[in-house]
C-alpha cells in the first residue's frame, strides 16, 4: 500500500520525529581488507597534532618519541595536543576542593580491588593481541599463552592467581635479557591415502621455540594491534581501533577501576551508568542549571563535539593526574597505577596485515606485509599512499610504528571523563569570579555544556573561556560541529533532551528481529526486546502489538514453522502438518512446531513453554522437555540466559531472557574445518580450560563458591572440598562407609600424583 510519509508526522512534535533521521535501519557498513591504511592515518594525524613537541629516542627500543606536553600555547583554532601540566593539576586540585575526600575514598576502594582481583579478570573481552603468536586471539587463550611463556621463563609469581602477582611477573619480564617463546607453525607434506590411493596434503602442527632478545620482547609487550572498527553507522570513512596485549591490560584495568570509582561520585559524569539511571543523573544537572537561572539570567546549552579526542589526549598527562590523585597513598599502589600511562607513552602501533597491492597490467594481486613498508620502493604506490608511508617511515620498527602521543580508542574512557569533568567543574562562580558560570555533562569524548549569564555577551564570554580552558589540557572543542540552543533542547550521547529526555526509539531498531541462536532462545529474546522497549523507550501498546505480529511472522519464515493448517509450502511443512493432525490440543504446540501464537502485549514476560504448558498433550510435553532426548546436546540449565543484542551505538549490550530448556534449545556443533589448521592446538587448550572450569564448578556450586583466597591451587581446593563433603555425607548417613573410604582413597591418590609431578 502507498503511504504518503508526511502524513505520519502531522500530529508528531518535531523533536519526536528526530529519531527517523537516524541511519539505523538496514545492515551497518563493515570494513573489508586490511586496516593498515587507517592505522597509518591515525599515527600520522596524532603526530601532526603534536608536531611542535620535543623529539627523544627511547633508550631500550630505539623508538623515536614525540612529547608535546607543556608545548607552545595555541595561537589558532587548529586541534592540538599541547596540554599544560600545571593547568591539569590545578583542575584536579579544584575538583578535589569541590568534592572533599573524593580521591582519597576512591583510592581506598581501588586498593581493595587491587588486592582481591584474580588474574581471570583478564579473560574477559574478545579479541586480544597475543604477543607470543604476534596476532589476535580470544582473551582467555592470549592470557593462557602469556602465563605459559612466563612460567617457562622462570616467572612464577602468577601462580598465586592474583592479578597483582601476574603484574609483578610482567614487570620482571621487562628486565630480563630475553624471553623464550613457543610459536605454532604448519608443516604440509604430500602423502598417499591408503584407502583411495590418491595423493593428499597432510598438515601437521608443529611448535618451535624462539628466543626474543630484550628489545624485541619490549616492542611486543608495548604493542597495540590495530583493526578497523566495524558496523559504524552514519559515517563514510572507517577508522582504526586498537587492542592491547596482556602486559598492558591488567595495568589499564586498575587505572580504570580508580577512575570509575571517581566518576561514580561526580554528578556531571555520564559514565559508568547507563540507560534510565544515566538519564536521571543528567536530568538533575539540567534541572539545577534551569532552577538557578531565575528570571534575571539567560541559560544556553551547547551540544558539544570534540575534534579527535583520543589523538589529542596524552598518556603523560594521565600520569600527572594519577600522580596527583594518589599523592598520599602507599608507594606500591602509586607505582602500580603509574605503569599503564608510562607503557602508553612508549606504545607501538602494529600496522595490521599490510597493503593489498594489485597491478592491473600484470594481473597480479599480492599483499605487502607491514614489515616491508620500511624499505620497499615507493614508486609502486599511488600519491596518497606514498605520502602516508613517507610520513610514517621514521617511526617504523619491525612492522610497528612508534606512537607516543595520543591514546587510541577506548583505552582510558573513565580517566579521560574525569579530565573532562574537571574542566566542567571549573565553571563555578567561586572559581570564575565573573557574572557567567557553567556546568555540564561529560561521557568519554561527548559533552554538553550549560552556560548561564545575565546577558548574551556573558554567555559568549563563558563559552570562550570554556573553549580556551579546554585547549590548555588538550581538549579541542569543535566550533564547526558544536551548536548552541536555549537550555531545554540538546543532545548528549544520542539522548535527545527536550524538557526531559525524549525516547530515541530508532536506536533500538537493530535489536528487533530473530537473533539466530536457536528456536527457543530466539522466541524468548524477541519478546523480551519488545517488553523492554515498552518499559524503557515509549513503545506504545498499538506499536508493540504490531511489532509482536511482525516478529512472529519473521520467526516463522526464519525457522520455516508456519502454522500446521497453513497453505504455505516449505521443506518442513510435511512433518509439521503431520504433527498438527496428530495433536489433540493444537493450542499447546509451540510456534516453532507449527502451533498458534498465544503472545500478546500482556503476557510477554512468560516463556512460551510455560504459557502453553497446560494446553499441551501429555506425550508432547514428554517429548518437548526430555533431557534424555538424543537429538539435543544440552547445556547446563540456568533459569536466566544472557543474549547479546546490538543497540545502534555503543558496544553490544547483554540482555537477560528467561531460558526454559526444551528440545528446541539446541547448540550448533563447532565447524570441523578448524581442526585441520594451526588453530587446532589453541582449540584443544580452550577445551581443556573449559573442562577444568566445569569440573571446578561441580565442586563449588555457585552459591557456596567464593573466590579462593591464599595460594591453594584448583586441584587442592577441589580435593579438600571433596573430603569435607564426603565427611558430611557420611556422618549424615547419605553415603555408606565403603563409599566414604573409596572417596578418601581417591583424594590421597590425586595428592600423591601431584607430589610426584
From Swiss-Prot:
Its main location: host cell. Signal peptide: none annotated. This is RNA-directed RNA polymerase catalytic subunit. GO terms for biological process: DNA-templated transcription; symbiont-mediated suppression of host gene expression; symbiont-mediated suppression of host mRNA transcription via inhibition of RNA polymerase II activity; viral RNA genome replication; viral transcription. The lineage of its organism: Viruses, Riboviria, Orthornavirae, Negarnaviricota, Polyploviricotina. Keywords: Eukaryotic host gene expression shutoff by virus, Eukaryotic host transcription shutoff by virus, Host cytoplasm, Host gene expression shutoff by virus, Host nucleus, Host-virus interaction, Inhibition of host RNA polymerase II by virus, Nucleotide-binding, Nucleotidyltransferase, Phosphoprotein, RNA-directed RNA polymerase, Transferase, Viral RNA replication, Viral transcription. Belongs to the influenza viruses polymerase PB1 family. It is an enzyme of class 2 (transferase). It catalyses: RNA(n) + a ribonucleoside 5'-triphosphate = RNA(n+1) + diphosphate. It comes from the Viruses. HAMAP family: INFV_RDRP. Its EC number is 2.7.7.48. Residues 249-256 are annotated as: Promoter-binding site. Influenza RNA polymerase is composed of three subunits: PB1, PB2 and PA. Interacts (via N-terminus) with PA (via C-terminus). Interacts (via C-terminus) with PB2 (via N-terminus); this interaction is essential for transcription initiation. Phosphorylated by host PRKCA. GO terms for molecular function: nucleotide binding; RNA binding; RNA-directed RNA polymerase activity. GO terms for cellular component: host cell cytoplasm; host cell nucleus. RNA-dependent RNA polymerase which is responsible for replication and transcription of virus RNA segments. The transcription of viral mRNAs occurs by a unique mechanism called cap-snatching. 5' methylated caps of cellular mRNAs are cleaved after 10-13 nucleotides by PA. In turn, these short capped RNAs are used as primers by PB1 for transcription of viral mRNAs. During virus replication, PB1 initiates RNA synthesis and copy vRNA into complementary RNA (cRNA) which in turn serves as a template for the production of more vRNAs. A motif (Nuclear localization signal) lies at residues 187-195, 203-216. It is found in: Host nucleus; Host cytoplasm. Residues 50-82 are annotated as: Disordered. Residues 286-483 form the RdRp catalytic domain. Residues 55-64 have a biased composition (Polar residues).
Amino acid at each position: 500500500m502507498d503511504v504518503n510519509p508526511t502524513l505520519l508526522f502531522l500530529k508528531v512534535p518535531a523533536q519526536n520525529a528526530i529519531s527517523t533521521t537516524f541511519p539505523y535501519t538496514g545492515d551497518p557498513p563493515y570494513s573489508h581488507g586490511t586496516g593498515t591504511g587507517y592505522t597509518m592515518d591515525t599515527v600520522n594525524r596524532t603526530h601532526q597534532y603534536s608536531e611542535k613537541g620535543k623529539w627523544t629516542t627511547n633508550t631500550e627500543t630505539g623508538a623515536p618519541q614525540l612529547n608535546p606536553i607543556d608545548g607552545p600555547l595555541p595561537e589558532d583554532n587548529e586541534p592540538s595536543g599541547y596540554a599544560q601540566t600545571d593547568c591539569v593539576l590545578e583542575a584536579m586540585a579544584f575538583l578535589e576542593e569541590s568534592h572533599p575526600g573524593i580521591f582519597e575514598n576512591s583510592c581506598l576502594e581501588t586498593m581493595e580491588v587491587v588486592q582481591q582481583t584474580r588474574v581471570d579478570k583478564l579473560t574477559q573481552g574478545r579479541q586480544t593481541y597475543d604477543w607470543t603468536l604476534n596476532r589476535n586471539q580470544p582473551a582467555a587463550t592470549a592470557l593462557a599463552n602469556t602465563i605459559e611463556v612466563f612460567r617457562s621463563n622462570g616467572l612464577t609469581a602468577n601462580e598465586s592467581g592474583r592479578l597483582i602477582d601476574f603484574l609483578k611477573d610482567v614487570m620482571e619480564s621487562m628486565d630480563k635479557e630475553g624471553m623464550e617463546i613457543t610459536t605454532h607453525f604448519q608443516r604440509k607434506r604430500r602423502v598417499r591415502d591408503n584407502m583411495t590411493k590418491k595423493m593428499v596434503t597432510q598438515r601437521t602442527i608443529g611448535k618451535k621455540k624462539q628466543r626474543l632478545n630484550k628489545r624485541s620482547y619490549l616492542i611486543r609487550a608495548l604493542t597495540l594491534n590495530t583493526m578497523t572498527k566495524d558496523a559504524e553507522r552514519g559515517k563514510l570513512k572507517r577508522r582504526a581501533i586498537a587492542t592491547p596485549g596482556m602486559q598492558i591490560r591488567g595495568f589499564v584495568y586498575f587505572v580504570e577501576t580508580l577512575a570509575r570509582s571517581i566518576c561514580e561520585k561526580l554528578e556531571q559524569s555520564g559514565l559508568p551508568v547507563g540507560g534510565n539511571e544515566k538519564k536521571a543523573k543528567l536530568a538533575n544537572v539540567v534541572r539545577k542549571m534551569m532552577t538557578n537561572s531565575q528570571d534575571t539570567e539567560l541559560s544556553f546549552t551547547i551540544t558539544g563535539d570534540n575534534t579527535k579526542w583520543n589523538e589529542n589526549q596524552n598518556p603523560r598527562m594521565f600520569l600527572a593526574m594519577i600522580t596527583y590523585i594518589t599523592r598520599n597513598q602507599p608507594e606500591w599502589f602509586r607505582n602500580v597505577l603509574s605503569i599503564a600511562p608510562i607503557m602508553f607513552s612508549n606504545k607501538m602501533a602494529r600496522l595490521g596485515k599490510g597493503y593489498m597491492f594489485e597491478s592491473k597490467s600484470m594481473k597480479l594481486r599480492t599483499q605487502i606485509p607491514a614489515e616491508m613498508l620500511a624499505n620497499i620502493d615507493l614508486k609502486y604506490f599511488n600519491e596518497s599512499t606514498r605520502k602516508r608511508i613517507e610520513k610514517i617511515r621514521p617511526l617504523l620498527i619491525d612492522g610497528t610504528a612508534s606512537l607516543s602521543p595520543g591514546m587510541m580508542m577506548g583505552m582510558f574512557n573513565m580517566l579521560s571523563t574525569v579530565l573532562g569533568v574537571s574542566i566542567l567543574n571549573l565553571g563555578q562562580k567561586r572559581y570564575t569570579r565573573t557574572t557567567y558560570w557553567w556546568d555540564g555533562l561529560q561521557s568519554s569524548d561527548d559533552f554538553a555544556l550549560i552556560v548561564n549569564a545575565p546577558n548574551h555577551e556573558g554567555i559568549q564570554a563563558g563559552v570562550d573561556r570554556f573553549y580556551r580552558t579546554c585547549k590548555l589540557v588538550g581538549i579541542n572543542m569543535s566550533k564547526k560541529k558544536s551548536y548552541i540552543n536555549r537550555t531545554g533542547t540538546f543532545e548528549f550521547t544520542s539522548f535527545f533532551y527536550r524538557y526531559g529526555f525524549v525516547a530515541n526509539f530508532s536506536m533500538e531498531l537493530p535489536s528487533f528481529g530473530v537473533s539466530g541462536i536457536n528456536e527457543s532462545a530466539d522466541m524468548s529474546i524477541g519478546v523480551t526486546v519488545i517488553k523492554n522497549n515498552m518499559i524503557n523507550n515509549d513503545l506504545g501498546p498499538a506499536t508493540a502489538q504490531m511489532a509482536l505480529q511482525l516478529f512472529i511472522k519473521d520467526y516463522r519464515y526464519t525457522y520455516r514453522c508456519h502454522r500446521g493448517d497453513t497453505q504455505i509450502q516449505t521443506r518442513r511443512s510435511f512433518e509439521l502438518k503431520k504433527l498438527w493432525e496428530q495433536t489433540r490440543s493444537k493450542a499447546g504446540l509451540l510456534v516453532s512446531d507449527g502451533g498458534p501464537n498465544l503472545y500478546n502485549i500482556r503476557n510477554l514476560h512468560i516463556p512460551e513453554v510455560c504459557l502453553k504448558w497446560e494446553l499441551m498433550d501429555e506425550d508432547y510435553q514428554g517429548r518437548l522437555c526430555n533431557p534424555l532426548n538424543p537429538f539435543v546436546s544440552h547445556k547446563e540449565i540456568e533459569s536466566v540466559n544472557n543474549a547479546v543484542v546490538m543497540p545502534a551505538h555503543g558496544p553490544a549490550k547483554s540482555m537477560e531472557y528467561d531460558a526454559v530448556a526444551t528440545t528446541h534449545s539446541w547448540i550448533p556443533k563447532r565447524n570441523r574445518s578448524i581442526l585441520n589448521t594451526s588453530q587446532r592446538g589453541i582449540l584443544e587448550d580452550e577445551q581443556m580450560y573449559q573442562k577444568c572450569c566445569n569440573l571446578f564448578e561441580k565442586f563449588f556450586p555457585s552459591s557456596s563458591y567464593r573466590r579462593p583466597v591464599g595460594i591453594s591451587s584448583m586441584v587442592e581446593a577441589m580435593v579438600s572440598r571433596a573430603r569435607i563433603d564426603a565427611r558430611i555425607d557420611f556422618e549424615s548417613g547419605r553415603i555408606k562407609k565403603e563409599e566414604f573410604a573409596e572417596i578418601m582413597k581417591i583424594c590421597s591418590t590425586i595428592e600423591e600424583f601431584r607430589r610426584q609431578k
